[in-house]
Regions:
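Single-stranded RNA-binding regions, centering on S1/OB-family and related RNA-binding modules
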Residues: 546-550, 554-719
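Structured, non-catalytic alpha/beta "coupling" segments that mediate domain-domain communication
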Residues: 73, 87, 98-101, 225-238, ...
C-alpha cells in the first residue's frame, strides 16, 4: 500500500483528495490557504482534518525513511533476506520496525556478547535447535570448557549458552509483538505510595487499573507523582499467562534440550523481555496521554481565542492586587490607552471609597461602558468594589457593566520585551491592566501576544513534549487568526505574524511600511512590502483586510485570485460592486439558486464551494465570524459562594474542558465542576462531545463545600 492509499484508509478520505493535499503541502502551501481557498481539491476538509493529515504524512514519511535506513544497515551486514525485506516493508509502526532490526543492531556489552566472545555460540545454536538427536546439555557443554577463555566448568558453558539463547528469544520480533499485545489486553498498572505524607496524589496511593482502561489524565497524574517521588509505579502481568505463549514459540517437546531452552526462555522473559516491554508500555501510555491532552488543550484553546469581541466600547481594565494596589487602565474603542491610575481598595474602608470616587471620575471623563476585572489575586475584593462603583454611576445616565476576565499569561506578557516595545512609558503592572481591558475588547488580538501554553486551558501542559505541544497550539492560533481575518492597517506584528504566509520579519516589515507610507489603500499594495514575495502574497492576501480600500472586495475574504470570478458572479445576477458596498444583495442567494449553482460556478470559472464562499462574503463585507457566536456574560451585580444553595439554576461560562468534567464560571470566583456523569443525559466518552470552552451553559448547583472551595454542578439536571 503506498503512502496516499495508507493515509486515505487511515483517515477515511478519498485518495484523490489526499493526493491533492499532499501535493499542495509539498508545494509549500499553508494549511489556512488550503482549507479556505482549495476546497474543490480536497472535498472541503476543515483545518483540523488537514493538520491531522499533515501530521500523519510526516509520521509515515519518517517511518518510510527508517525502514530504508534499517534495510540498508542489515544489507551492509550481508544479512538482508527477501523475507526480512517484506517484513520490514509491511511494518505499520516504528516499534515494529525496531523489533525487526533488534537482532542486527550493534549491541552494548551484554552477558550474551561476553558468552559469544568465549566461543559459546555454537553450543547455544546446538541446544536451541532442539533436534531429536541432540545430546543432553551437560554432555554437549563438556566440549566447550576452556579455562583460557574463561569457561572453567560445564556450568559456566551452559550459563553462557543460556544467556545467548535468552537474548536471541528477546530479540524475536514475533514474540515481542505477541507479548506486547498481551500486556495491552491483560496487563495492569499498579501505583503505590512511596511516602506516608498526604498529597494531591492520595487517589493513587493504592491504585490498580488495567492498561486497556487507563484514562489519559490518570496516566499523566501518576507520571507526575512518580517524578516527584511520591508514587511507585509498575506494570504487572500474570507470569503464568505469558510463559505458555513464550514456550509455544521456542520449545520443541521431546528434545533432550527442551527443559534447558524452557529455562532460558523464562530467563529471557524475566530479565530481558518484560522489563523492556514494561518501559515500552509506559512510554506508549504516556505518548497516548500526551496526544490526548494536547488535542484537548488545542480543542479548549480554539473557543477561547474565538470569544466574541466587545468592539468599539471604551473599557476600563482592572488588574487587582493587595500590596501594590489595583492597577487601572482606560482604553478607547480601538484599544488605545486614554488614562491610567493605581487605587487601593483593599487597604481599608476609606481607601475603598477613595478608589470608587477616583474610578467614577475616570468613567465620567472617558465615557467608560465596560469594566474588565482580572481573575487573579484580590479579584473578589475588586469585584465587590466594582459593583458598588457601578451602582453609583448607573444611578445617573451611565450604563456600565463588568466581566471577570482570565488574566492567565498577562503578567508574563507585561514583563516581556514585546510589552516593553508596545508600552515603553508604562511600568509592568499598568501594562497588565491594559492587556486585561483589551482582552474584553478583542480576545484574539490580545492573546496572540502570549505563548499559548500560558493561557492555561490544558492539563499537565508542562509535562508534555514541548515541541509537539507548541506545534499543535501554534496551529490552532494560526487557524483562528486566519478564520477571523486581520485588518492590515491596525494589526500588531504579533497578530500579523500569525497570518498564513507571513513570519516575524515580514510582519514587522508590514508595520514599518505602514508607518512610513501611511495606511494601505489596497491589497495590491501589500506586494510592495520588503521581503514579501509572490508566494507569500498568494498565501496571505485573502486573510488581510483593507477597510480603507476603494474596492470593497479588499475588505472581504474573497482571494484576489477570485476577484474576476466575483465580478462575473455579480454581473450574472444583475448586481455591481456598488451594491455590495451599499448592502443591496439580499436577493443574491435566491438568484444564484434559481440560476443553478453548478451552472453559475462553471460560467465564472470556479468550483461550487468557492462560489458559495464568494456569495457569503459579498453579503457581509468586513464581517467577523466571531460576531455570530454567543455573546460574553456582562454583569452588574456580584454573587458569592455563601449565596449558593443546592437546586439553584444559574448561567455560566465554560472555562475548561478536561477528561473527567467541565469547569464552569458562575460568577463566584471559584469555578464549579460539572462531573462527566452530570454533563449529558446520554452516554458520552468525553465532555468535549457536548461543550467547548467559552460556551454559555445553564447549570444546577448540586453541592457547595465552602471550606474546600468546591462547587458541584449539573448540566443535565438543568435541561
Amino acid at each position: 500500500m503506498d503512502l496516499i492509499q495508507a493515509l486515505a484508509a487511515e483517515l477515511g478520505k478519498d485518495p484523490r483528495h489526499v493526493e491533492n493535499v499532499v501535493h499542495l503541502l509539498d508545494e509549500g502551501n499553508t494549511i489556512p490557504l488550503i482549507a479556505r481557498y482549495r476546497k474543490e481539491l480536497h472535498g472541503a476538509m476543515d483545518d483540523t482534518s488537514l493538520r491531522t493529515l499533515e501530521e500523519r504524512l510526516q509520521y509515515l514519511r519518517g517511518l518510510e525513511e527508517r525502514r530504508e535506513a534499517v534495510k540498508k544497515s542489515i544489507d551492509e551486514q550481508g544479512k538482508l533476506t527477501d523475507e526480512l525485506t517484506a517484513a520490514i516493508d509491511s511494518a505499520k509502526t516504528l516499534a515494529e520496525v525496531e523489533d525487526l532490526y533488534r537482532p542486527y543492531k550493534q549491541k552494548r556489552r551484554t552477558r550474551a556478547t561476553m558468552a559469544k566472545e568465549k566461543g559459546l555460540e555454537p553450543l547455544a545454536a546446538l541446544l536451541f535447535a532442539q533436534e531429536r538427536d541432540c545430546p543432553r546439555p551437560e554432555e554437549a557443554a563438556r566440549d566447550f570448557v576452556d579455562p583460557e577463555k574463561g569457561v572453567e566448568t560445564v556450568e559456566d558453558a551452559l550459563q553462557g549458552a543460556s544467556d545467548i539463547i535468552a537474548e536471541q528469544i528477546s530479540d524475536d520480533a514475533a514474540i515481542r509483538k505477541s507479548l506486547r499485545a498481551l500486556i495491552s489486553r491483560q496487563g495492569q498498572l499498579v501505583s503505590r505510595a512511596a511516602t506516608e505524607d498526604d498529597s494531591v496524589y492520595r487517589l493513587y496511593y493504592d491504585f490498580t487499573q488495567s492498561v486497556a482502561r487507563l484514562q489519559g489524565h490518570q496516566v499523566l497524574a501518576i507520571n507526575r507523582g512518580e517524578k516527584e517521588g511520591i508514587l511507585k509505579v509498575s506494570i504487572t502481568l500474570d507470569r503464568e499467562q505469558a510463559l505458555p505463549l513464550l514456550r509455544r514459540a521456542v520449545v520443541k517437546p521431546g528434545s533432550a534440550a527442551m527443559e534447558f531452552v524452557k529455562s532460558a526462555a523464562e530467563d529471557a522473559y524475566d530479565r530481558l523481555i518484560f522489563p523492556s516491554l514494561e518501559r515500552e508500555v509506559r512510554n506508549q501510555l504516556t505518548e497516548q496521554a500526551d496526544e490526548g491532552a494536547i488535542g484537548q488543550f488545542a480543542l479548549n484553546l480554539k473557543p477561547l481565542l474565538m470569544q466574541p469581541p466587545v468592539k468599539g466600547k471604551v473599557t476600563m481594565g482592572l488588574d487587582p492586587g493587595y500590596r501594590m494596589g489595583c492597577k487601572v487602565a482606560v482604553v478607547d474603542g480601538t484599544g488605545k490607552v486614554l488614562d491610567t491610575a493605581v487605587v487601593y481598595p483593599t487597604y481599608g474602608e476609606r481607601q475603598k471609597n477613595e478608589a470608587i470616587a477616583a474610578l467614577a471620575t475616570l468613567i465620567k471623563k472617558h465615557g467608560v461602558e465596560h469594566i474588565a476585572i482580572g481573575n487573579g489575586t484580590a479579584s473578589r475584593e475588586t469585584e465587590q468594589m466594582a459593583v458598588e462603583l457601578i451602582r453609583q454611576v448607573n444611578e445617573g445616565s451611565a450604563h456600565v457593566s463588568y466581566m471577570i476576565v482570565s488574566e492567565a499569561g498577562a503578567s508574563v506578557y507585561s514583563a516581556s520585551k514585546l510589552a516593553a516595545e508596545e508600552f515603553p512609558q508604562y511600568d509592568v503592572n499598568l501594562r497588565s491592566a491594559v492587556s486585561i481591558a483589551r482582552r474584553l475588547q478583542d480576545p484574539l488580538a490580545e492573546l496572540v501576544k502570549i505563548d499559548p501554553k500560558a493561557i492555561g486551558v490544558g492539563q499537565y501542559q508542562h509535562d508534555m513534549p514541548q515541541k509537539q505541544l507548541d506545534e499543535a497550539l501554534n496551529g490552532v492560533v494560526e487557524d483562528c487568526v486566519n478564520a477571523v481575518g486581520v485588518d492590515i492597517n491596525t494589526a500588531s506584528p504579533s497578530l500579523l505574524q500569525r497570518v498564513a504566509g507571513l513570519n516575524g520579519t515580514t510582519a514587522k516589515n508590514v508595520v514599518s511600511y505602514r508607518e512610513e507610507n501611511g495606511a494601505f489603500t489596497s491589497r495590491a499594495q501589500i506586494k510592495k512590502v520588503p521581503k514579501l514575495g509572490p508566494k507569500a502574497f498568494q498565501q496571505c492576501a485573502g486573510f488581510l483586510r483593507v477597510p480603507e480600500s476603494r474596492s470593497v472586495l479588499d475588505n472581504t475574504a474573497v482571494h484576489p485570485e477570485s476577484y474576476e470570478a466575483a465580478k462575473a458572479l455579480l454581473a450574472l445576477s444583475g448586481h455591481t460592486l456598488a451594491d455590495v458596498k451599499e448592502g443591496k444583495l439580499s436577493d443574491l442567494p435566491a438568484r444564484i439558486k434559481a440560476y443553478g449553482e453548478d451552472k453559475a460556478a462553471g460560467e465564472i470559472g470556479v468550483g461550487v464551494p468557492t462560489l458559495r464562499d464568494i456569495v457569503s462574503e459579498l453579503l457581509k463585507p468586513g464581517r467577523d465570524v466571531r460576531d455570530e457566536l454567543p455573546k460574553p456574560i456582562l454583569r452588574t451585580d456580584v454573587l458569592e459562594m455563601k449565596d449558593l444553595k443546592s437546586g439553584m439554576v444559574l448561567t455560566g461560562t465554560v472555562r475548561n474542558v478536561i477528561d473527567f468534567g467541565v469547569f464552569v464560571d458562575i460568577g463566584v470566583h471559584q469555578d464549579g465542576l460539572v462531573h462527566i456523569s452530570q454533563v449529558s443525559n446520554k452516554f458520552i466518552k468525553h465532555p468535549s462531545e457536548v461543550v467547548s470552552v467559552g460556551d454559555v451553559v445553564k447549570v444546577v448547583v448540586l453541592e457547595v463545600d465552602e471550606k474546600k472551595k468546591r462547587i458541584s454542578l449539573s448540566m443535565k439536571q438543568a435541561k
